[in-house]
Amino acid sequence: MSEQAVENTVLDRFECRSCGYVYEPEKGDNKHDIAPETPFAELPINWRCPVCTAKKAAFTNIGPAGTASGFRENLGYGLGVNKLTPAQKNILIFGALALGFLFFISLYGLQ
């Protein structure tokens, strides 16, 4: 594996399939005294989910935080919106709704 591929998987978050808890390496795990910046692969073998006590095998990789959602091969489709992060998509959607609302309210000013 290349150095870039190894670096990308280090900061990946993992989600518990049982309860939905997300292990974020940037934060670590205070309940089990896991230091921040500890990758999921370096957690002890006996580490369990702090919420439901599921084993490490019950976790799935959901990728790093702040990246575009969806499959990487699908990010090139559409009008470029697929490359936006979920927060950027929220701003785009609700910003457009607010502008539309203001436009229709401004029609009351016409005589």
Swiss-Prot record:
Rubredoxin is a small nonheme, iron protein lacking acid-labile sulfide. Its single Fe, chelated to 4 Cys, functions as an electron acceptor and may also stabilize the conformation of the molecule. Could be involved in hydrogenase-linked redox processes. InterPro entries: Rubredoxin-like_dom, Rubredoxin_dom, Rubredoxin_ET. Binds 1 Fe(3+) ion per subunit. One of its GO terms (molecular function) is iron ion binding. Its cofactor is Fe(3+). Keywords: Electron transport, Iron, Metal-binding, Transport. This is Rubredoxin. Belongs to the rubredoxin family. The gene is rub.
